């Protein structure tokens, strides 16, 4: 059964309350078993960074965001947060020759490749020269 690695933008979209989340993304996610959804420690890093920034600039909103993040990390994705391994590093290095890929994207792509997963993201262009299956639920 196919498994899916969520890019940070998918998690951020699903966090939106009420009808603010894109209906295509919600429908795509609801059509599959949540146990098939994974995130990378890189996504965890990006989310934690956002929470820390919000806590600094708006403590009340930061507290709400922190509670959401802890629940996401400790319950929603418990057992489905993928680490960076030596294999991930080797794959990521190969993704950066001859074309360099900036920041977190190549780490997330390498994690998807290592674990034979489809990468679910809105940022298709960021992964255009990487041999990984991309799914854009905004376009589904």
Model-derived regions, located:
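Histidine- and aromatic-rich ligand-binding microenvironments
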Residues: 6-7, 40, 101-102, 123
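Acidic, PIN/NYN-like endoribonuclease modules and their adjacent C-terminal/linker elements
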Residues: 1-3, 109-140
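Short amphipathic alpha-helical segments and helix-helix/interface helices
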Residues: 25-30, 108-109, 124
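Short, well-structured N-terminal submotif of metal-dependent ribonuclease cores
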Residues: 1-39, 53-69, 140
């Amino acid at each position: 059964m196919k498994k899916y690695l969520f890019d940070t933008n998918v998690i951020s979209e699903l966090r939106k309350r009420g009808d603010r989340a894109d209906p295509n993304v919600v429908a795509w996610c609801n059509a599959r078993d949540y146990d098939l959804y994974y995130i990378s420690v890189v996504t965890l890093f990006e989310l934690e960074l956002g929470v820390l920034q919000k806590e600094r600039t708006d403590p009340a909103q930061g507290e709400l965001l922190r509670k959401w993040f802890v629940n996401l990390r400790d319950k929603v994705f418990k057992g489905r947060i993928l680490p960076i391994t030596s294999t991930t590093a080797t794959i990521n290095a190969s993704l950066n020759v001859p074309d360099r890929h900036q920041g977190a994207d190549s780490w997330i792509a390498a994690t998807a490749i290592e674990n034979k997963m489809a990468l679910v993201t809105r940022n298709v262009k960021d992964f255009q020269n990487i041999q990984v299956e991309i799914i854009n639920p905004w376009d589904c």
